From Swiss-Prot:
Specifically catalyzes the N1-methylation of pseudouridine at position 54 (Psi54) in tRNAs. The lineage of its organism: Archaea, Methanobacteriati, Methanobacteriota, Thermococci, Thermococcales. This is tRNA (pseudouridine(54)-N(1))-methyltransferase. Pfam families: Methyltrn_RNA_2 (PF04013). It is found in: Cytoplasm. Signal peptide: none annotated. Its main location: cytoplasm. InterPro entries: Alpha/beta_knot_MTases, TrmY, tRNA_m1G_MTases_N. Belongs to the methyltransferase superfamily. TrmY family. The gene is trmY.
């Protein structure tokens, strides 16, 4: 199983965003839609060997974590952002009533919402995965032999904060796909294709 953890610094934590203006009213929730599509979609189906955690830190009640579990996923992911945004909207609606910090509630089969922080998610994932931080100054991906259950941490268009990077020191190995900053959706697609070829 490969895992991707995306920290979304501005993505809203309320379902009150317009499907007609995902970047503006959703705090760039459009990035999450593209990320999910790149993480899971194949030409004729979805990947069952992928798990995604997205931690949202936008207004009004951060954090919220939306978790997609490939082997259990029954919801239909389509290439368009709008239908994926509807899934996120439903998860955030159910997440409004959550009070416990780490309890997950199933929204659809394979889709969960919680109040987990970025740190909570990393700690949970590292119990059964080897962590890698995807960043421009990391070791080239071509030089790394990945274990059975790799987990990749990356940021949105704003990246990770210095505090997040300090938290990852010593627990996540830095790796890069190139020396430039790429879109998160492109990074996850590249990593999936790279691992497919191993």
């Amino acid at each position: 199983m490969r895992t991707f953890i995306l920290k979304a610094n501005t993505a809203v934590t309320s379902p009150d965003f317009s499907l007609k203006d995902l970047p503006g009213t959703g705090g760039r929730i459009d990035l999450l839609c593209r990320f999910l599509n790149s993480a899971f979609l194949l030409s004729h189906g979805i990947r069952k060997d992928v798990r995604v955690f997205m931690t949202l830190y936008g207004r009004p009640n951060p954090p919220k974590t939306i978790h997609f579990e490939g082997p259990k996923l029954k919801v239909r992911l389509n290439p368009d952002e709008r239908s994926t945004a509807l899934i996120l909207k439903k998860a955030l609606k159910i997440g409004e009533d959550l009070r416990e910090p780490t309890k997950e509630v199933e929204v659809f089969p394979g889709v969960y919402v919680s109040n987990m922080t970025f740190e909570d998610v990393v700690r949970r994932v590292m119990k059964d995965s080897t962590l890698y931080y995807l960043v421009e100054d990391g070791k080239p991906i071509t030089e790394i032999e990945f274990p059975q259950n790799p987990a990749f941490v990356l940021g949105d268009h704003l990246g990770l904060s210095k505090e997040d990077e300090r938290f990852l020191e010593g627990i996540a190995k830095k790796v890069r796909i190139g020396r430039r900053s790429y879109l998160a959706s492109h990074v996850v697609a590249f990593v999936n294709i790279w691992l497919d070829g191993m």
